[in-house]
Amino acid sequence: MNKEKNSYRDAIKDVELTMMAIDSHFRTHKGFTDSYLLVMILENEVGETRLEVSEGLTFDEVGYIVGSVSDNILHMHTYNYCEKNREDIYKWLKASRIEKFKSDYAKMLMNMHFGKENNVGSNINLKEEF
């Protein structure tokens, strides 16, 4: 249990460091930039779901990744690196880092926030779990 908590804390520290770099990017580029965060919730042929978050992509790279995915895309969103998207970027980075240590995290996210009763793209409120 302690090992899992330490891994979780390390993941959060990694996100905080990444967000510091992104904040610097926001200060330099006040408006929209040519850099994107790609969020996908994927389902393989046996029904297992996973969350994939790719950082710092150009628009062409986003198109290439989406076009080369062989799994079923249950949810996909692209966030431009700009100040107004800061909170969404932070939440998805956090979710992607935590998912490495919690194997059912993508499925839980999908069920809670992207189910039939909810609108796709609703805001996600990730909370500390320890």
Swiss-Prot record:
Domain of life: Viruses
Keywords: Early protein, Host-virus interaction
InterPro entries tied to this protein: P56
Keyword ATP-binding: no
The keyword Cell inner membrane appears for this protein: no
Role summary: Inhibits the host uracil-DNA glycosylase (UDG), an enzyme which removes uracil residues from DNA by the base excision repair. Interacts with host uracil-DNA glycosylase and prevents the latter from binding to DNA. Since the viral DNA polymerase efficiently incorporates dUMP into DNA, the virus needs to prevent the deleterious effect caused by host UDG when it eliminates uracil residues present in the viral genome.
Subunit details: Homodimer. Interacts with host UDG; this interaction inhibits the uracil-DNA glycosylase.
Family according to the record: Belongs to the phi29likevirus protein p56 family.
Protein name in UniProt: Protein p56
Originating species: Bacillus phage GA-1 (Bacteriophage GA-1)
Lineage summary: Viruses, Duplodnaviria, Heunggongvirae, Uroviricota, Caudoviricetes
